[in-house]
């Protein structure tokens, strides 16, 4: 995909499409043209039916879904506590682990937080990353052999926010490099 192939008119046409609830029988409702699902209802649905509908919603429908109740806030809180402990340990050890967007030391980052969480607190790791709804959506879009990676980025007061960018696999590439990839991977 080349920059000159990107047309605002094409984006406007996609954005103008209306999501119809009747096309997605497993969805609970549509809000702001986005499908909203109830996690418990998806869990109780035939897995193949849920996979098909989610893949269709992501690929041919609005391209985004909301699944209410997918993540237990207490699990997120437990993982957040461990992540801040890891950041505190990094800072105490004099490791300035910043991001690509702010001056060193302004923001905090945990590279490979997936492994670091697993080592720091295996139970929290399993509860956090073993989410059945995230697995369902990931399998619907990527297939059963998807792989997870995770980083933690904290924009601290006074730190520069990240700018819109692509992470792996089309992350920090020149336009010429990106143009070599087919449209569907953008």
For each feature predicted by the language model, list its residue ranges.
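Short loop-to-beta-strand entry elements in the cores of soluble alpha/beta enzymes
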Residues: 66-68
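Non-heme Fe(II) oxygenase catalytic core, chiefly the N-lobe of the double-stranded beta-helix
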Residues: 53, 57-62, 71-186
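Fe(II)/2-oxoglutarate
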Residues: 1-60
């Amino acid at each position: 995909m080349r920059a000159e192939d990107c047309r605002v008119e094409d984006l406007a046409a996609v954005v103008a499409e209306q999501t119809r609830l009747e096309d997605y029988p497993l969805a609970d409702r549509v809000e702001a043209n986005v499908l909203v699902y109830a996690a418990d209802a998806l869990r109780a649905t035939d897995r193949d039916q849920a996979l098909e509908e989610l893949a269709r919603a992501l690929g041919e429908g609005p391209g985004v879904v909301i699944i209410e109740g997918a993540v237990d806030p207490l699990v997120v809180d437990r993982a957040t506590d461990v992540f801040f402990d890891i950041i505190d340990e990094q800072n105490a050890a004099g490791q300035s682990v910043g991001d690509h967007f702010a001056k060193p030391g302004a923001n905090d980052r945990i590279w490979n937080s997936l492994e670091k969480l697993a080592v720091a607190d295996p139970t929290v790791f399993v509860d956090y990353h073993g989410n059945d709804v995230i697995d369902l959506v990931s399998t619907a879009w990527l297939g059963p052999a998807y792989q997870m990676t995770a980083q933690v980025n904290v924009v601290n007061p006074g730190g520069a926010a990240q700018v819109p960018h692509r992470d792996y696999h089309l992350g920090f590439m020149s336009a010429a490099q990106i143009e070599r990839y087919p449209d569907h991977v953008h």
